[in-house]
């Protein structure tokens, strides 16, 4: 991706991007889109069966990212009700229009004035589905399988209730102090947190070898609370109790995020890493 900020750079970068696309993919086709520089990354979880039933399960804020990859997600977002309802209508209409059948996620960039722009639809379960499960009580993986088997949804939109607040931190084998560089190695200590409202999904274990060739995700630490403040407090505790040694991880980064004034106030955007002085 290239960002053009004036007519001159647009022409030059258009030529550069076409050349890069031709060299990498054998096709010089490129997309030109409006550049949204200060926005939130909001995504809606949808579930649709083979019988025409479609529901959404609320939205997640995935604005804290590095290299356009998500690091922290939370649900519900802090959208105002008007924006949330309008986007939800668009999501349900789009899902029905394409005849979608399964779990999926429709993603947007949202500006502070409520203007929102469609990014993509992920036609699969996502890493951050866990926090939606925590606030809705639904097992999304189970429903993905049941829908594929032809089962009918046992509920409609009126039955969906979002209760409380949930946050997910992706614990990656990366070094935040070195621009999130990969940190392969062997885990010499590995202990996950527990307690009320804490959920950890992880494949890692003591002695696990972190490869430099695959995704750096070691685990997903999720915290649930009746309120956002309680979820943040539980996440802080979970991060303090999560012990990983032998490789660098994003745990210290997440701990700073939980104390960052902008995050605590819910005032985060996709440029959070570039604009936050405390991170």
Cite the ranges covered by each PLM segment.
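ATP-dependent carboxylate activation and anion-phosphoryl transfer catalytic cores
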Residues: 3-279
């Amino acid at each position: 991706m290239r960002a053009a900020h004036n007519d001159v750079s647009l022409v030059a970068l258009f030529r550069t991007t076409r050349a890069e696309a031709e060299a990498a993919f054998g096709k010089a086709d490129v997309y030109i889109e409006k550049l949204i520089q200060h926005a939130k990354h909001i995504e809606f979880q949808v579930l649709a069966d083979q019988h025409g039933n479609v529901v959404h399960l609320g939205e997640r804020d995935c604005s804290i990212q590095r290299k356009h990859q998500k690091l922290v997600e939370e649900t519900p977002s802090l959208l105002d009700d008007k924006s949330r309802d309008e986007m939800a209508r668009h999501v349900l209409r789009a899902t029905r229009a394409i005849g979608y059948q399964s779990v999926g996620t429709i993603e947007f960039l949202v500006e502070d004035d409520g203007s929102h722009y469609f990014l993509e639809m992920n036609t699969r379960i996502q890493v951050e589905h866990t926090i939606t499960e925590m606030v809705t009580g639904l097992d999304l993986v189970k429903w993905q399988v049941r829908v594929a088997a032809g089962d009918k949804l046992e509920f409609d939109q009126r039955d969906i209730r979002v209760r409380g607040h949930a946050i997910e931190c992706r614990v990656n084998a990366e070094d935040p102090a070195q621009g999130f560089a990969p940190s392969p190695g062997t885990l010499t200590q590995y202990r996950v947190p527990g307690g009320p409202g804490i959920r950890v999904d992880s494949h890692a274990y003591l002695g696990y070898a972190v490869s430099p060739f695959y995704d750096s995700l070691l685990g997903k630490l999720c915290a649930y609370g009746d309120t956002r403040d309680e979820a943040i407090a539980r996440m802080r505790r979970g991060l303090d109790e999560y012990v990983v040694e032998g490789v660098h991880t994003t745990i210290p980064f997440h701990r700073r995020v939980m104390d960052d004034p902008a995050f605590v106030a819910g005032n985060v955007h996709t440029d959070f890493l570039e604009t936050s002085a405390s991170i």
